[in-house]
């Protein structure tokens, strides 16, 4: 039972770090996730990101994230979580966001559409075999979803901030809008996956829930170059801690990690 909860918490943590499309991927990022088991880090899952041109909205992109447990854990507890966001390619404002969570016998879907003319977000929440409900949330300005906010953060001009500056962000999470922030922690030279390079480091304020402790319990290392790759994420969760490290990245410009 302890392993089940550890795995569920781990992949939930990584996702807060590929369907067929007629468009080729603009960018693909593949992460291996690790759970801190006492004094060692245990490989437990993967998270794959794929960014393509949206087929549903003009001047928009479609970002898909898939998190799944490794076969060595599947016989204990299987996780297959999928998140999809369609957002404006310049402002990162979302048009549509969905999450399909399949964790053991737990199956739940979240589907949101953002209606800017009416200033509302409409949600369809479905717990398979249990309930289905619709939510209407008042849409506030500059509200991101769980995926679009990650791509927006990659474009922040961190060079204009001082260490410990707070950058406000607003996110829709489970039918509620939260005013949070990113704390900028400065530039460090880090060795990640055997490679040293300069990184911007920042810590987002987290909402406490089934996975995360509330507060500044996550750190993100972003490459200080033209690609702004999220190289590593570390977070404390309710039981232990998790880490996701970028294994592979590619785009129409080539493989950044070679």
Segments from the language model and where they lie:
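Short polybasic amphipathic segments
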Residues: 119-127, 169
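Acidic, serine/threonine-rich low-complexity disordered tracts
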Residues: 20-116, 158-258
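Sec-dependent N-terminal signal peptides
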Residues: 4-14
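Sec/Tat signal peptide C-region and signal peptidase I cleavage site
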Residues: 15-19
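A contiguous pocket-lining binding segment that forms or flanks enzyme active sites
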Residues: 151-158
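Acidic/charged, solvent-exposed loop-and-adjacent secondary-structure segments enriched in E/D, K/R, S/T
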Residues: 126-141
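Intrinsically disordered, low-complexity regions enriched in acidic/Ser/Thr/Pro/Gln residues
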Residues: 144-147
């Amino acid at each position: 039972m302890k392993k089940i909860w550890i795995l569920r918490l781990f992949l939930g943590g990584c996702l807060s770090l590929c369907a067929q499309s007629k468009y080729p991927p603009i960018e693909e990022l593949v992460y291996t996730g690790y759970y801190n088991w006492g004094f060692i880090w245990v490989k437990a899952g993967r998270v794959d990101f794929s960014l393509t041109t949206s087929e549903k909205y003009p001047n928009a992109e479609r970002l898909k994230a898939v998190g799944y447990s490794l076969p060595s854990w599947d016989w204990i507890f299987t996780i297959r979580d999928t998140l999809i966001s369609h957002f404006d390619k310049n402002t990162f404002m979302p048009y549509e966001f969905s999450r399909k969570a399949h964790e053991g016998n737990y199956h739940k879907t979240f589907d949101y559409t953002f209606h800017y003319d009416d200033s509302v977000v409409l949600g369809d929440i479905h717990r398979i075999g249990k309930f289905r409900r619709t939510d209407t949330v008042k849409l506030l300005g500059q509200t991101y979803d769980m995926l679009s906010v990650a791509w927006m953060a990659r474009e922040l001009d961190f060079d204009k901030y001082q260490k410990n500056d707070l950058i406000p962000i607003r996110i829709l999470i489970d039918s509620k809008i939260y005013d949070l922030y990113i704390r900028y922690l400065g530039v460090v030279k880090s060795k990640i996956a055997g490679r040293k390079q300069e990184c911007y480091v920042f810590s987002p304020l987290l909402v406490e829930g089934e996975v995360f402790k509330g507060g500044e319990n996550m750190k993100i290392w972003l490459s200080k170059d033209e690609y702004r790759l999220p190289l590593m994420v570390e977070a404390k969760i309710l039981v232990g801690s998790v880490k996701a490290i970028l294994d592979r990245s590619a785009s129409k410009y080539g493989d950044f990690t070679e």
